[in-house]
Amino acid sequence: MWNVIESDKIPFSPYPKGTANIKRIAEQKTVGCKRFTGFGLLEIPPGGVFPEHTHPDREEIYYVLSGSGTIIVEDKEISAKEGLAVYVSGEHPHGIRNQTDKPLTVLFVHVQI
């Protein structure tokens, strides 16, 4: 199985909590993959927050594409800037804050454990 995804045709939408926007480029329900559960982008505006959350059934990787901010994992605050990647085992609370005056764009990947 394979799929071509025209991500430029997929809009960002408000994330239900916090102040981030999310673009869900590929998910199990949209591309039919089995263990790969999500791939997309987060746009966190200046002063915005992608709230802390957990998902014990999935692992996640964040990759900062542009901007800077803080990635929180448990009680650790990680200074995030372009090119930084962070792996999180989903049972650990994690989220992202943008305390700057420029947008922060983060690529995320979820894989089912």
Model-derived regions: residue spans:
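Asparagine-centered strand-capping/turn motif at beta-strand->loop junctions
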Residues: 96-99
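Short, conserved beta-strand element in jelly-roll/cupin
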Residues: 41-45, 55-71
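Conserved short histidine dyad/triad with adjacent acidic residue
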Residues: 24-28, 40-55
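A short, N-terminal "cap"/entry segment at the start of jelly-roll beta-barrel domains
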Residues: 1-37
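Short acidic-glycine-tyrosine-enriched beta hairpin
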Residues: 75-90
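Structural motif
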Residues: 68-70, 77, 93, 103
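A short hydrophobic beta-strand segment most commonly corresponding to one strand
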Residues: 87, 102-113
